[in-house]
Amino acid sequence: MTNSVLRVVEHLRERAHDVLIVAPGAGPDSYRGAPVVRIPALDVPGVGSLPIGVPTRTVLTALAGFRPDVVHLASPFVVGARGLAAARRLRVPSIAVYQTDIAGFAAAYGFGLATRAAWRWVRRLHSRADRTLAPSTDSVEQLRLHGIPRVHRWARGVDIERFSPSHADQALRSELAPNGELLVGFVGRLAPEKEVGRLTALAGVDGIRVVVVGDGPELASLRERLPGAAFLGAKYGDELSAAYASLDVFVHTGPHETFCQAVQEAMASGLPVLAPDAGGPKDLVLPGRTGYLLPADRAGFADALVSKVNDLRDDALRARLGEKARKVVLGRTWPAVCSELVGHYEAVQGRIARAA
């Protein structure tokens, strides 16, 4: 289950709402008092770190027994399609949350011919939901351009206590930058769609230490391409908080983000952010105020990355951008965002969409 789904469940349970979760793969059979119905999961060839659920009649059976007022479909693609069909059969309103740029994902994994097919499938699914929620202005526009109706924007929250400059670890900084290097970091899954290899533009730049936090299928390749970088592996909880807050600059490299929670967590941690001028980061980064948006193409990104990182050697500039970055996200708490989601639930009550 994704972090956003867990935060939604927590919000609903704290307010005494009944919740049933249907999730792929092995795991606990409950979360915060909400039962979890488990369905089988399979690895996608070439994308082993992202297993997908196998649709079964269990979805319909579970929903029929639970009798929900609304069905929340988190990033529907395979299992979500079965959930949507079950909701329509039971005449229960549904909300589909668009979280993954499926077409961009397909292209990143070399499935270029599947891009159009992916959009056809996305359109078919989301057109049958009573409301689609997309996390950024860019993703809302993309969905509407592809003919998907009833699209609304619903962003993501951030835990401003978990992610804060106060979690900086001076011992970690000393270990990573023994000679006072500028620590430029990436946090996320090391996979083709993230294009972490763009950080090679910084390889060999004097006074710069690249820090990579995460794991995934590209790890071995990235170690070869970034021999001087520090690879910290996947971090969670307090270690993740410390990793963010101990950096000087945060860089996100992938151009296919529908939102980009890592950017928001970095901002909450008081870091200036460099990210492609594409997708979700366009809503999050205020150029010249909280960081900079760089050209989305690889060559342009590489040139701008080196230039902006060199600019950010200036302590005063980093401090100003980082302070503003945190201020910008202080109002984006999970309770506020989840209350907005409940408003969407209420808006679809009694409405069953027709297939477009």
Predicted regions and their residues:
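Short alpha-helical donor nucleotide-sugar binding micro-motif in glycosyltransferases
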Residues: 63, 126, 234-235, 242-247
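Donor nucleotide-sugar binding/catalytic pocket of nucleotide-sugar-dependent glycosyltransferases
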Residues: 23, 119-169, 178-179, 232
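Nucleotide-activated donor-binding/catalytic signature segment of Leloir-type glycosyltransferases, i.e.
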Residues: 220-238
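Aromatic "clamp/platform" in nucleotide-sugar-dependent glycosyltransferases that forms part
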Residues: 255
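Conserved donor-binding/catalytic core segment of Leloir-type glycosyltransferases
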Residues: 177-207, 211
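N-terminal subdomain of nucleotide-sugar transferases
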Residues: 1-40, 334-339, 346, 353
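Short hydrophobic beta-strand element within catalytic cores of glycosyltransferases
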Residues: 272-275, 285
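Conserved acidic donor-binding segment of nucleotide-sugar-dependent glycosyltransferases
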Residues: 287-288, 292-300, 308-315
